[in-house]
Amino acid sequence: MIDSNRKWSLIMKNTLHNLVKTELHCHLDGSLSFETIRELAEMANIALPESDSELAKLVTVPEDSETLLDYLKTFDFIRPLLQTQKALSLAAYDVAKQAAAEHVLYIEIRFAPELSMDKGLSAVQVVEAVEKGLQKAQRDFNIVAKVLICGMRQSSKQLTKEIFRQINQAKSLEFAGFDFAGNEHDFPPQEIADLIRFTQRLDRPMTFHAGECGCPSHIAQSIALGIKRLGHVTAIHDHPELIADFVENKVTAELCLTSNLQTKAAKSLAEFPYQELYEAGAKITINTDNRTVSNTNLTKEYQLFVDYFGTSLADFYHFNQNAIEASFASEAEKAELLAELKKAYGQTD
């Protein structure tokens, strides 16, 4: 006979799985299912271990990971698998399918086109392929899935500008906005400020990785540059004046709990800034960052917030509202998504 605590745990897990969710911070190359990784490897003639346990050692973060750079090394294995349009379309479809399976209503999937240009694809061809996969997923599942284009902070500024310019000018593309990822420690916002301003002049919305490497100054610099969505912001912990500035400027936080504990951006739950941001009234969203690399999904993340912080269903509803309002969807799409979210959570006026 199942004990009452175990029964309650199963009920809660099922409840969280069935909750309608949204996600703003999900990396394509870090979120491929094992099944799709195997399919892509076969297409690329790359040998893989037969067992999933051995494959996991190649594509999930090692337990002894100490830094963000250690964590990022895991992506090197996936890069050769994403060098054709067919592979990119399959990958995009796979990630959106995973999200839809746990009732994600809206997702923004981000990736760096330059990482899929090793075999001759142009930046525009890369984005076209990803969009094709997401369009198929939207037809097959009840999900809205959009593309975010990442620049790699450590790459040539000229290369990033050229890629962004080409993509922005391509009338065939429907991508939602821009982001900057990669080596934050050596390339803080001030170092790439001209690149950020260039991107802002393209008249597309943008988000930005900041505060993932223990540097609260990077969050302050990002806010000063006028960026209204920031990924991670982990280093804001124990900086009340910065939190106040964050709230005053109406910036939205893309929190990634599991990932931050793995990269040691937060060395413990006590250093993860959720509670401080929550109490200050900050705009919070919950995200996976990398489903496969971090061995997580949104249901697992929600469970952690319940277990660690006592997060309520009302909180989850509010965080999903935040995500839709801060999303790079159109105003018409936002209104429709908010109405669907409200209905799903049984909210009334």
Curated annotation (Swiss-Prot):
Residues noted as binding Zn(2+) in the record, renumbered to the chain: H25, H27, H209, D289
One Pfam family linked to the record: A_deaminase
Q: Could you say which cofactors this protein requires? A: Zn(2+)
Gene that codes for this?
add
Q: Which InterPro entries match?
A: A_deaminase, A_deaminase_dom, Ado/ade_deaminase, Metal_Hydrolase
Enumerate the HAMAP family for this protein: A_deaminase (MF_00540)
Carries keyword Zinc? yes
Cofactor mode of binding and number, as noted: Binds 1 zinc ion per subunit.
Q: Which UniProt keywords apply?
A: Hydrolase, Metal-binding, Nucleotide metabolism, Zinc
Instruction: Spell out the Gene3D superfamilies in the cross-references.
Output: Metal-dependent hydrolases
GO MF terms on file? 2'-deoxyadenosine deaminase activity; adenosine deaminase activity; zinc ion binding
Q: Where is the active site?
A: E212
CDD domains listed in its UniProt record: ADA
What is the protein's name according to its record?
Adenosine deaminase
Function comment: Catalyzes the hydrolytic deamination of adenosine and 2-deoxyadenosine.
